[in-house]
Amino acid sequence: MKDHSPRKPEWLKQRLSAGDGFGALQRLLSSKGIHTVCRSAKCPNLQECWSEGTATFLLLGNVCTRTCRFCAIDTSRTPAAPETDEPERVAAAARTMALQFVVLTSVTRDDLPDGGAAHWVETIRAIRKASPRAGIECLIPDFAGNEAALDLVCKERPDVLNHNIETVPRLYEKVRPEARYRRSLDLLQRAASLFGLTTKSGMMVGMGESFEEVGEALQDLARHGCRMITIGQYLQPSARHIPVERYVTPEEFAGFRDLALSLGFSSVQSGPFVRSSYHAAASSAACTPVP
């Protein structure tokens, strides 16, 4: 696919420099064979977060069964079986890093009957055993609409249950054809209403959506009980991914933030480099408890 993306504006040009903690964290994760979404998804904040000693752990391997056209993670219909010792390795890494807030995510595993939900449960329990004071945010897939699988994770009562809608409904067929917008909204509503969890979602902009469409999606999320939101600029990972339609200005991101706050979101992160787990601990702390 030929790259037709517009030229990057000045506000998206980063000066990258690795801090003292970057190398130590890289060695720790490598030694334990742990995957991170930071590296697998080519996150632009990798050096900043790793230098500060934080990372988002990627569960169930680093190969996804879906082919979302914005995502840099490798794909296959038949990925390797989950590693049974991964929960303990992740928990050990979180303890070594002395994390006060642990962010977990995973690839989508449509090849597994429960979508990997039992593996999620084992990981949450292992972290709580190793680091009982640590908060946990779970950025989960949609489990193909399997409510029993979703309930397994919700029953572990993570501090934040995160699931990204990613984009506006009009662009789903183009951007993430194997997902369903309504399914994602229903997931968030079930976690919030049935289990009383603090729910969070995220969107990328710059793929052809309008401001009004983003506003409508934010209203949908608010109506379905979502209380935290992240909004960031889509950046094309490679020439085979969908191109950037436009670069959203910092002023527009401020507008998204103001709109989300007016709709009742308790925590809003909106900016060019914002990603799902960016400043996750601070966002969780800023979110008022569920009544």
From Swiss-Prot:
Record protein name field: Lipoyl synthase
Phosphoprotein among keywords: no
HAMAP family referenced in this protein's UniProt entry, alphabetically: Lipoyl_synth
Enzyme class: transferase
Amino acids binding [4Fe-4S] cluster 2: C64, C68, C71
Cystine pairings recorded for this chain: none
Gene name of the record: lipA
Entry note: cofactor: Binds 2 [4Fe-4S] clusters per subunit. One cluster is coordinated with 3 cysteines and an exchangeable S-adenosyl-L-methionine.
Organism: Chlorobium luteolum (strain DSM 273 / BCRC 81028 / 2530)
PANTHER family: LIPOYL SYNTHASE (PTHR10949), LIPOYL SYNTHASE, MITOCHONDRIAL (PTHR10949:SF0)
Positions contributing to [4Fe-4S] cluster 1 binding: C38, C43, C49, S277
Keyword Transmembrane: no
